[in-house]
Amino acid sequence: TNSVIRKNGDAVLGKGQALEAKKLVPGLEHQLGEYLRRYGNRAFYMGVHRVGDRLTSLVTFPTKHHYRDNSDLDLIMRSAVQLKEIAAKFQLSKIYLPPVGCGLGKLDYEKQVRLVLNQVLDDDRFVVVLGYKGL
């Protein structure tokens, strides 16, 4: 995700994983827009939602400051720390994430992102799903 809020208060979830999440969770852009306005660009626990036949906890994971930017490794590090805190607080036993910051974020997973994530997401609760093509 990114920190951009539209004039109507909704977060911009226009492409990539953010758009996929928006399609699955009605009202996500409004809820996230409110959180961004109040607390800034950080990871947020967005509650439990039905995805297909499963109940799934949704956590945002900012990789960009603005949707036009490339992803930022320092922000990914900060988001990973926040994700780990959220996982502990809400007792999330398994967290699946795409190779964050890659694709539209223009980072290379093996050369850049993996090193950052491995510093923080250092136990088997966290699983990066490579080859992920969307929800």
Residue ranges and their predicted role:
Residues 1-135:
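Macrodomain-like recognition of ADP-ribose-binding/processing modules
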